[in-house]
Amino acid sequence: MSLGVCSSPWAGIAFSNGPRWHTLRTLTMGALKDMGLGTRNIEERIVEEAAALCNELGQNQAPFNPRQLLCNAVSNVICAVVFGQRYSYEDPDFKTLLDLLNDNFKLISSQWGQMYNMFPSVMDWVPGPHQRIFHNFELLRAFIYDHIWKHQKSRKSGEPRDFVDCFLDQIEKEKQDPWSHYYMDSLVMTTHNLFFGGTETTSNTLRYGLLILLKYPEVTSGYPSSPGSPRGIRGLSLNLPFPSASPEKVQEEIDRVVGRDRAPRLEDRDHLPYTNAVVHEIQRLVSVLPMGLPRAVTQDTHFRGCFLPKGTHIIPLFVSAYRDSIQFKDPQCFDPTNFLDEKGAFRANKAFMPFATGKRMCLGAGLARMEIFLFLTTILQRFKLTPTEKPEDIDLTPQYTALGNGPPPYELRVLAR
């Protein structure tokens, strides 16, 4: 989103600075923890949603695009934390919310969105699809306002049911303070930040993950692609080199460790090193957020011979670390062994920063890690994935790339295992 919009007085936590940012982040992190973030409660919620997702996936006998179902599942986890409820996948308001989020993510990552970010005063007067960003944004604000109004009607002060109630309690406590950072517009924008940051990025990671597994079935089940099939991924020049003694494949590992009689849990992650490595390598390779959000230096700074005056806007390019051959062998290749040691145990890498780093890293990083792992492992436990074209013909070139990398549209078949 343009800095001209996001730096407005009613901006939420994502683009705030100084004491305002610290105040909003402290409340938001506290409220999210109170609502179960990082606890068994939120894990149970994700496991339940993963089961609901698989039930929906299993109803598709013909090839289908998984985008909507994956967005539904991911967003429902956010809805449970923020609004205290989940939606039916057929709910029209829920569908509208997700369509607006998806449309804005694509628009902001388009050439039109990037042009607006660079020349907002000019692009304000230029007709084009970028103008739809602001219309969508107002519809999203109206959706959130409606939920807040319903909460105000039903809440009990001091007995928060969800994030919105926690924020409303704080607004009530500081209503006499003219300098308070807690007011209705900051609640609306912070809620919008949580939805925007926690829905499209996670669902795009899952969509890209399934697409990669369709292209390389040997990763999933151990069955190789057709003999002599090229390893290159058209458009990105990526390939998949396997060592001669490759680790157990994902479904084999899940079957051995988890079995078929219960759902995967976070406690299984340490016992699924290859699966965990595949999840990390998917995130590294596709780089759903290749750049971090714009930041500003708070004082005059000298960096590698360059002088950055106070207030200079900077944008970290995290994808540069993911393509660094010092950090990752064959960085243009999809290779899960980037996250495995010589004995096949999982190995972390400090250059892996899908949720940014430092004090301003993604608020929902822990939640996103849980969702990506549990959704993917549950899907692979329950289904065999089948592409609608030859694996070697699958193209991983992003549909759009700028703020975010979006996977190209595709269809797949799922067969119960």
Give residue ranges: language-model regions:
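Cytochrome P450 substrate-recognition site 1
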Residues: M1-I42, L70-V77, D93-V122, P398, ...
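Conserved cytochrome P450 catalytic core segment spanning the I/J/K helices
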Residues: K33-L37, S110, H135-L206, G228-N239, ...
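Cytochrome P450 catalytic-core helices
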Residues: T201-V219, R234-P243, Q251-E253, G366-Q381
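Conserved cytochrome P450 K-helix/beta-meander segment immediately N-terminal to the heme-binding cysteine loop
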Residues: S221, R269, P316-K343
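Conserved cytochrome P450 K-helix E-x-x-R motif and the immediately C-terminal K′/meander segment
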Residues: L139-A142, F242, P247, A263-G305, ...
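Cytochrome P450
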Residues: G36-E48, L57-A80, S88-T96, F119-F143, ...
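Cytochrome P450 heme-binding "Cys pocket" and the immediately downstream C-terminal segment
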Residues: S246, A365-L403
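Cytochrome P450 heme-thiolate "Cys pocket" and heme-binding signature region
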Residues: R304, E342-I372, T397-Q399
